[in-house]
Amino acid sequence: KKNSNKLVLGDGNINSPIMLIGEAPAAEEEKTGLTFMGETGDLLKKMLHAIDIKKQNIYSTYTVNFRPPEDRKPTSTEIKRYSQFLQKHITIIKPKIIILMGSTAMESLTGLNSKISAERGKWKEVIVENSTYNIIITFNPSYLLRAPENKKHSWEDLKKIKQKIIDLNLDI
């Protein structure tokens, strides 16, 4: 946790059927203690709005709950260190849908260490403490700010999320 001042645990509706898991907080998130702030948060809000979801109506957290030095990607060691905490977090929230945003979230919950482009947009199931959860992997909004050409793929993923919400008759 060198260079990190504050843990960013999660925020939003703890009773939501949707849990969104990102990579790790950046400077603004660390400062405010809230998830997905600044430009990344603005893009996430627009993405969710496109499928009729308000960010405050879902629960969001991070794979690694501290800001890595120089905002670098969390290491596999850091991901493993926080994975038990993340799994406990999931069992407390008990979401019907988990949206994994980015490769760090994907690696933590699925063990996959492949490219997001190969795994995104597919519904999978993951077992956490004897309960099965529906997950979908998509790009992290911070990545989309750097690689906007992938927004079209995220839109496809968002439409699948919207359809799953309808199929499961979830109230968001």
Can you name each region flagged by the protein language model?
Residues K1-I172:
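A polyanion-binding, active-site-adjacent surface
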